[in-house]
Amino acid sequence: MHLSHLLAWALLLTLLSLRAEAKPPSPQPQVPRSPGDEASEAVAANGGGKKGDKEPKGDRPRLLRELRLDTRSRGSRGVWTRLLHDHPNPRKYKPANKKGLSKGCFGLKLDRIGSTSGLGC
């Protein structure tokens, strides 16, 4: 019995390793370009910066792109932390404050219809 389990696991691991080797690596997904990137590249190409800038012209669009990606990842990170660390809202589980509930003749709560119609007692 143990030998058959061992052989089954070995076969499974072999098949998984062959499957991983047979698959060519997937190309990196291209980030869709927005009009803002094209505009910033055009400004950088035309020398839109100050003359005293020490940054090369090609670094500015890359920095802008990285900044935009960083803000996206920060926003998604906030969503994940909220989902994973969702503390229950105490007001959500607290029953509504019901003022003016009258007691019936025998100490039981009257329902809304019984209290308004006067048929409770």
Curated annotation (Swiss-Prot):
Its domain of life reads: Eukaryota
The record's family statement is: In the C-terminal section; belongs to the natriuretic peptide family.
Q: Where is this region: Disordered?
A: 22-70, 80-99
| Tissue localization of expression | Expressed by the venom gland.
Which residues are trimmed away as propeptide when the chain matures?
A: 23-44, 64-82
Q: Which modifications occur after translation, per UniProt?
A: Stereoinversion of L-Leu-84 (in ovCNP-39a) to D-Leu-84 (in ovCNP-39b).
Q: Where is the composition biased (Basic residues)?
A: 90-99
Where is the cross-link described as Alanine isoaspartyl cyclopeptide (Ala-Asn)? A45-N46
Q: What does this protein do?
A: Venom component with vasorelaxant activity. In vitro stimulates the production of cGMP in rat aortic smooth muscle cells and histamine release from rat peritoneal mast cells. Induces relaxation of isolated rat uterus. Induces local edema following subplantar injection into rat hind paw. Forms voltage-dependent cation channels which are weakly selective for potassium relative to sodium, and whose conductance decreases with increasing dehydration energy of the monovalent cation. Venom peptide 1 induces slow and continuous calcium influx in IMR-32 human neuroblastoma cells. Venom peptide 4 weakly induces calcium influx in IMR-32 human neuroblastoma cells while venom peptide 2 was not observed to induce calcium influx.
Where does the signal peptide begin and end?
1-22
Supply the name of the protein: C-type natriuretic peptide
The listed locations are:
Secreted
Which keywords are on file for this protein? Answer: D-amino acid, Hypotensive agent, Ion channel, Ion transport, Neurotoxin, Potassium, Potassium channel, Potassium transport, Secreted, Signal, Sodium, Sodium channel, Sodium transport, Toxin, Transport, Vasoactive, Vasodilator
Q: Which residues form a coiled coil?
A: none
Q: Which GO biological-process labels does this protein carry?
A: cGMP biosynthetic process; receptor guanylyl cyclase signaling pathway; regulation of blood pressure; vasodilation; venom-mediated edema in another organism; venom-mediated mast cell degranulation in another organism; venom-mediated relaxation of uterine smooth muscle
Give residue spans, biased composition: Basic and acidic residues: 50-70
Annotated organism of origin? Ornithorhynchus anatinus (Duckbill platypus)
Q: Which residues cross the membrane?
A: none
Modification sites for D-leucine:
L84
One GO cellular component, as annotated: extracellular region
GO molecular function terms noted in the UniProt entry: hormone activity; hormone receptor binding; potassium channel activity; sodium channel activity; toxin activity
